[in-house]
Amino acid sequence: MGLVASCFGGLAAYAAESVACCCGSAACSLCCRSCPSCTNSTSTRITYAILFFLSSIAAWIMLDKDVSKGLMKVCCYHSTLFRLVLFTQPAIKTTTNVVPWGELGVMRIMFSVCLFHLFLSLCTIGVSSSKDPRSSLHNGMWFIKLILLVGAMVGSFFISNSFFIGASWSWIGLVGAVLFMIVQFILLVDFAYSWNDSWVGKLEEGSKCAGFGSYRLISATVMLMAFVITLTVLMFHFYTNGDCKLSNFFIGFNLALALLVTLTSMLPSVREALPSSGILQSSVVAAYATYLVWSAVSGVPSTCHPLIAVAPLFLSSRGFLPPLPYVALKPAECGGDAGTNTAAIVIGALLTFISVAYSSIRTSSKSQLGKLGLQQGSNENIYLMDDKAADFDEDDEDRRLQRVVDNEQDAVRYSWSFFHLTFAVAALYLMMVLTEWDSSDADVRIGKGWASVWVQVVSSWVIFLLYGWTMMAPVCLPDRDFS
């Protein structure tokens, strides 16, 4: 309960700090005088990312069934309204005949976050500049929005458990998670190409740092390939013992796909049709796909688990890492080892939030909307500009004051509606990840189970497929413009 109080206390503290900004720009300048000036298009996205991070921590804590059940009792059991909801709802049936309080807590938190961003997405449809009266819903009113978000989280505990356990919400969560994963995979491939184009472009310019740039390009490629090879060897050594034939297939097939896309990227026909193709992109895609396979095989419900990954357990026991309430630190009935799964969960949680934040911010820009096939046309009033290029006409004294400069008076820098829509499906994706893709079991250990295994394995195959198509499409369809 202390963790819950501290988490929601953090939200309350953050809300209190935002009250000053609600009172006017002078208060912000007084509180943040030493901070550099920034634009509202940047500060707004950062603020929403922080809110999503705090909400994710709250959902993480809710994985402890005792915390979720205790919060429900403290907040609602003494409420007459909740008594009516509790005693009139149908009984929950699970394989163990025990209510999955941890999963229910996660679903309620992410349900609130999803509704919050869906509401803002609907309210900001068609906004073309900050002069629109609806701009305050997106760039301001932070204290009110924080109250609404926290209120939605608390209010979600009054909703019948059968709503979250039922098939309808499960399908909604699954569809939203799959949509976010597709966007995430497209951005991963795009990131690989952008990274390669950036470094190769500097080499072709012939700058003084060209030699260092070549060293960076080669070093990054070698390090990523070394990561793929090392992790693959370790997986073959630790995860292919006994009757682990399926894990053996997953690892071997992933290695074959990695070699295939790497060799394909070096084919003369591919290089001619797509000059930007290279081994760096293949290494980025292969590294992420190999991580997904490792995370999958570490969650296979069998005896195919080594006694490794002691570091996360050691750091957690010494207080350097927060306790992970959803990880059972003992072998499960299936014979799996919790140490390996703990490492997969810690790394997976970090990568999940990074990808959520990156995807939510990147997909809202005009260039990314075009790559996703969602650009609204050439007349779309979205300017993709460098926020640092905003002109400041104020005097020197005002420049020393912290101000959030409105750089969207003429046109918005990104699609506000699609920005919130991405956060909404990101909340559903994180909900499905934390609930092991909604297994609806009471004693669930996150990351364990065939649903989680197959989702991650198939995801690795889809990434290879998307990347392979980006290389072969210009060859197979030379008349089309893929720029």
Swiss-Prot record:
Membrane-protein topology: Multi-pass membrane protein
Keyword Zinc: no
InterPro entries cross-referenced by the UniProt entry: TDE1/TMS
Major subcellular location class: endoplasmic reticulum
Localization per record: Endoplasmic reticulum membrane
Keyword Lipid biosynthesis appears in the UniProt entry: yes
GO cellular component: endoplasmic reticulum membrane; membrane
Similarity comment: family membership: Belongs to the TDE1 family.
Protein's job: Enhances the incorporation of serine into phosphatidylserine and sphingolipids.
Protein name in UniProt: Probable serine incorporator
Species name: Monosiga brevicollis (Choanoflagellate)
